[in-house]
């Protein structure tokens, strides 16, 4: 069910009166969670608020003096101009050169309408270059339609594809006009009913080199890949006669959408752990009115493993990840009214600015960061998702550690 804005008024009531009102709303069928919330591991309160993208830490770096600094400005500039290389391994000129080149296709797409205030793919949905066909291609069933879209997604290069109904709780309250960082309407068309969520695997060897500018090339490459893939798949759906809006980090929170689409389970490091690639993915999405059969969320046991594992939090240099159980709350850059593991976004981003590159140590050290194509790793996964998860955590001590960037360059 879509988020009902009437719930926000409950936050201002006394606890006893709020309980009475909620009880009446439940009897009237007004206050209802999405039926799949339990299966997805999503728990919300009446204090739930849709997230304003203006409060995203990357947006705040342009208008909020508690985040904006000379270091943050240098961080963003380093992706678009010649940076001052360091002597340290992983931060040489060739490391930054590879990282910046990996972002090229994404940057070209993002810059197309920046002069109009639309930083597409990050702070605005991607504009459509393909008109919707007048005649619709009809499929016998929504299941057939979903299978067709997934086939096309694999052809274009997506590593994972799932479908979920459009849950408006995860849409941003507004987008950002990058000309002055003011709030702007999302601009989604009416009638959208489903979200096609795509997963894009990051290079495992480069991820092993984090923290480094070289490791940042793994992120940039997938943003460039996903920009092409999500635009191509959206064009295909529009050619079939249905609305399709391509989206990357913009427009809505893709993590809960990926969970609802059955692609994986939410983890302590705030990532989606997938059965094929662990946390080593980027996600994109397409909003559409195409009648599709939605996938069901799955909870194989990742959260239970995270309950006993704190490797990501322990490894974080600035201690931005939580050690305790999931809880409500969080800072300005966190969605409110959702019980989950939440990072300190300000601490995390401050470390990025010190590196002049992104950091994914929490991804690298995650025990699920493995190549599950091999049978020993698949066996470990079964153990990790079983009541013997503690034994799997003990075995993780023998997993490969960090790869020195110089080693990556020296390999054939």
What is each of the regions a protein language model found here?
Residues 2-8:
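Extreme N-terminal basic, low-complexity initiation segments
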Residues 10-206, 212:
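Non-catalytic, usually N-terminal nucleic-acid engagement modules in DNA/RNA processing proteins
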Residues 109, 113, 352, 387, ...:
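Generic secondary-structure transition motif, activating predominantly at the C-termini of alpha-helices
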Residues 150, 156-373, 378-386:
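Catalytic cores of enzyme domains
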Residues 378-379, 384-395, 401:
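Charged, compositionally biased interaction regions
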Residues 394-412:
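Long, compositionally biased charged/polar accessory segments in the mid-to-C-terminal portions
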